Amino acid sequence: MRRLKIGIRPQLIIIVCFASLFSLLILGIVTGIYFSANLKNLRLERLLVISQLKRTQVQQAIQYIAYQVMTVSEVDSLTVPLSNYRAGNNSKAVFSEAQNYLQQYVLTTDSFTAARLYDLDLQVVASSFDNMTLISESAQDVVYPLQPNRSMPPVLGTPSGLYFTGPIANNSDNFNSRYFMGITVPVLSNSSIILSQPSISGYLTIVAAAESIRSALNSTSEDDYQAMAVQPVYGDPQKGIDNLSQNAYNGDNEVIGFKLVFPVENSLLEAGTIYNINSSSSMKTALASNSGTATGVKSFFGKKVAIGFSRISVQDNLNWSIVIVQSNSVFNGPANKLRKITIGVVIGIGAFMCFVTFPLAVWFIRPITKLKEATEAITKYKKEKLNSVNSNSPTSGSGSGSGSGSGSRANSDSSADQSLSLDTGKRNSINSSSFSSSYSTGIRLPARIPRSKKIFKDELTELSEAFNIMTEELDKQYTHLEDRVKLRTKELEASKIQAEAANEAKTVFIANISHELRTPLNGILGMTSIAMEEEDPNVIHDSLKLIHRSGELLLHILTELLTYSKNTLNRSKLEKSNFQILEIVYQVRSIFNKLAHDQRVNFKILVKPNIFRKLIIYGDSNRIIQIVMNLVSNSLKFTPVDGSVSVSFKLLGEYDHERSKKLDYKKVCILNDSSSSTVAVPPPTPPSDTKPNPKPKSTPTPKPDPTRSHLVDHNNRSANTTSPLTPVRKPTNQTKNKSITNNVTKQNMKIRKKKKTNKNLHNNNNNNKNDNSDFLMNRRLSGSHKFNNTNDEELSPTAIEKNIDKYLTSSADSDNISVTTLSTVQYETTIFESQFKSKPLPALPVDAKPQVSGKIDENDVNDEDPSGGSIKDDDSEDTINEKQGISSSPSSSSSSNEKQENSPRSNDSTTVTVTRPRHNMMPSAQDFKSYPTFDKKPEYDSNMSNNEIVKNNRVYRIRNMYQPKVWVIQIEVTDTGPGIEPALQEKVFEPFVQGDQTLSRSYGGTGLGLSICRQLATMMHGTLTLKSTIGKGSTFTLTLPLPQTGEIMVPPEDMAEFCEDEFNPAAKINRKVAFEDGDIDTESQQQENPSSEEDTQGDRNVQSSTSSSPPNSSSTDSALPASDSSDIGGTNKSKTTSHGNNKNINAKKRIITNSSASSTKGTKRHTNNDGGGGVNGNHSDDNKDLTLTIDKPSLFTRGSTGTANSGTTSSHSDKKILYPTPTTTTTTTTTTDHTTVLDDISHLRVLVAEDNSVNQEVISRMLKQEGITNLTMACNGAKAIDFVKESIENNENFDLIFMDVQMPEVDGLKATKMIRKNLQYNKPIIALTAFADESNVKECLNSGMSGFITKPISKTNIKKVLVEFLSNEVVTS
């Protein structure tokens, strides 16, 4: 089919005309829309600027009036009469000067028309008004807010309060009536020269004319816009307007209406009339935000308007919005005019283009015609040339290489030439059939142009394929771009959903945290007001307790918020040190045993495998304790009565750092574990285990032979499969293996023999398990102090420590902490107590022998060190007080000053009690304040500098790891609570999210605890996960990689005893049996000597469930009936009795009978008063008198009843256990001093440098309660330096200085440096700081301070500081 030919000239004319018109149309539309939008935006910005200018004018006018009023309120003519009146001068003449001043002020100013001066009873004591301007009665009721029958606005209760009333028209019926507004401010005066801060003595109300404010709102052109001052009206949509909150924002109400402050000309809205907020979308928009613009909104009368608004922010009750209103017709007038101009221009240009296109087309087509003719000529010549070449080429393919090549090229050219044919009969035509496709380019399309079906063709047809290729490429790019846009859209939608969820969570959090913050504040304010009106000291004391607990709760909430923010900003740092896992275990148990007992929750702690106890690991133990405390406290909070909470500490295996790093530490991987799970096979069972630990199904491990487990030699590494360590050096001799099977068999026979005997005896004890005397006794004692074993007659350092302990456990210490603030207080207490101890773990000397013997022979004991019983062995200097009666007196070695202690252990092992300096003691449960408990000595005594540790009176050496290994530990906290929904199990780790997000939730909290725990776990490259089942409970799993830096060298024969504690499920202490002392021989006593924290260092027998124990003991099963070998009634009575005599105990070693062994039925234990104990003291039989040294605070829990001091016979008839008195002491002493070391410290001089008067009062009263009366107060660092300098010059040095860190003039750090360097002051300086952070603590200590106390200041911390730093001063004095 032949195509109809149309020349390029007509096509060009049509295309140019169409293109010009179409382009102009597009340009006109785009330009019109763009410039119209810009013009509207400029108009809106104009309205906004006008509203901001009006707002500024009004605000400046109001502030100017307020400034004048505040200036008047500070005039002496007003403040002095009020101060005199408040001081008691009630004469009428006292306010005459104020009356004259107000009258003169009102008459001489045009802005003010009236004034009133009120006293604190809101009675008018002076008033003045302008006779020329009379204020109507209705207006006076509004502008004068203070009346006796009205409540005073809360804002006036603050010294800087400012309260506005009005404006109100003097005559509401007259449009031009004057407007007045009242400004009320408190009048401050200082009625006493003692007080530095002025107080509120009265109030001043001045009525000012509001004409200056009204004039600022007048518009220059009424036809252009209207300026309105709009005041929102708050209230409940259901109940209506709240008249009390019309002038102030109330968070519980919302804007339900509005009213005009001043009338507006040419407006039907009346000033002072309240209109519904929904009746005008323009006002609703204006009152919804502080400033902005809006178009297309409707006015009160339904007309579309454009507005610009800005809100005034002067005071809470003055929240006007300045609204500039412009009608839609006026606002869109310039844009409509621009649109008409654009349309006219487009039509004119289109007509002009059509007129000039025809002659231009004729002229422009000539080059194209010439080019076509030249192309046709070239094509014709090429075709003829190719035909001649084809005719001359050979027909055969054979011939020379040249001929073959020519023939090939000729055939190729011929075949190519056949694709072109020249139509010589027609003009301006080219046959393009050789192309596979030919598309029309009549219009430009973004897609591939199909082959044209037109009946004509032109020169542009050949360009269609190239265009289509380009179009295909563009199509690919557009498609790829569209996919990317869709992907970005999905990401934006996901981000939007996530942001909405976060906003919703924050909204719920704000509601919840408001309740959490107001709850303690309500307790503080309410109980304060109650205590101020009470006269009963007991009621006041109870009120103060509640105030203290509420303050701790508030501190806990704020600390969690600050901790989360600090972790989010990556400002938290890990404070790593060497520690043993039992340190964490004992602290957790000490903290939560009492809480679980009170809640009747079975609380258990397990450590497995037993070899875990031998590891010295390196990490931030405080952060680990913080995580575990948070998890355990959450479990106890949600676990019901008779439920259970268990904490298990597991050693999983060696850490695979490479795999964990590849996973970005999202999981903690273990070596030789093919799966990505963090669960791995635990190490083989250590010697003391009776059954293998459970292993995961995925990685089976052969069960170790229990008969060979306790025959493993530590020095024989080829046979040792339980130790995770590699040898440091080859030992010189082998340790002989020894089995304890025979001993265990004998012991089991005795267990069965005595089980029946004790059955009835334990049942009788059940009736006394809830005696309140033990609980009251526990609440009056503090369990956070250290003890040392010594028999010193003089005030040696160890004797001082004993008296210090007595001082700390006095009944005056009532600083009981709150359950709710447990974790916060514990962590801050850990930081506080870190100044009293350090735990270095130096490298083991090259020539040192890895001695692991726990037996010290008498021949190894040499001369004592004067520091309080220090003796030397072959390798190191140890402070050892042998149980057989090794003398510890620094001044005499005679036997008269020695004490014999009877040990129930066998003769083949010497039991020793090792006393260490306080700074070398390994922290244990008593080092952290939890619930007040009995004072006991730490379970562990370590001397890290000598690389040794003491447990159960046995000395074990610590070997350093020269190639430390990194182990994976797992801490699981499992409870039987209600569980967490699956949808929330991952969200609970997000900030501000809780398991119960409703406002009716049963438990409080900020929703940040678990988030902080996961942050801390992530900082340590660990994980924190949750598994929970609704109705069954939850399990939180903390998995951490921690490097091992050392190992406690325990011989295989001592491994069973070393692992004998309540945290070992296979330990003897957890067996449900009891013994009577009369039938237990020395051998069985040695085998049944557990190492739990509740056991004392003397006679320790395996106990059954005690009758006084709660269902939360970590060592027994709550399902079994409770029983005990001690009479709890007698124990409780003795605790109450002995507490009264606690202050009369001599400053000597405390001797106490173990309540779990010494108070058994039918057994008598007498203290040894013969005084004949020497170095070679005789061991007493089990039926003879036994003495026992109290270890540490005994928690009143199952597995260990409360321990009571006993200096008399434990009788079965009266069932009383008494503390030793001076007449029944177990030591032969010649001293008659019955006072403690710190009983008389009134002579000591103390300087307190504190700038805050309240803090000065607090610390001064606390120090006076402790007996220090010679106090000197300094308000800044410069004063403190002057006082110290003056005391040194007068030879009356201060014994102790409390230095605040932040003070004016000279801060505490700089002052300390100057005192230390310039004045050579060498006495203790204690920092008082509110920033309880490790970095701040280090800065304080580096500046020369001796210690620190964090604010809020605690009496317990004050006591500890006095004990630590004033003991030497007391002894010297």
From Swiss-Prot:
It comes from the Eukaryota. Residues 512-1044 form the Histidine kinase domain. The phosphorelay mechanism involves the sequential transfer of a phosphate group from His-515 (H1) in the histidine kinase domain (transmitter domain) to Asp-1300 (D1) of the response regulatory domain (receiver domain). This transfer probably occurs between two SLN1 molecules, rather than intramolecularly. Pfam families: HATPase_c (PF02518), HisKA (PF00512), Response_reg (PF00072). It is found in: Cell membrane. InterPro entries: CheY-like_superfamily, HAMP_dom, HATPase_C_sf, His_kinase_dom, HisK_dim/P_dom, HisK_dim/P_sf, Sig_transdc_His_kin-like_C, Sig_transdc_resp-reg_receiver. Its main location: membrane. Its EC number is 2.7.13.3. The modification 4-aspartylphosphate is found at residue 1300. Residues 749-759 have a biased composition (Basic residues). Residues 456-493 form a coiled coil. GO terms for biological process: cell wall organization; cellular response to farnesol; filamentous growth of a population of unicellular organisms in response to biotic stimulus; filamentous growth of a unicellular organism; osmosensory signaling via phosphorelay pathway; phosphorelay signal transduction system; positive regulation of filamentous growth of a population of unicellular organisms in response to biotic stimulus. One of its GO terms (molecular function) is osmosensor activity. Glycans are attached at residues 89, 131, 149, 170, 190, 218, 243, 278, 319. This is Histidine protein kinase SLN1. The gene is SLN1.
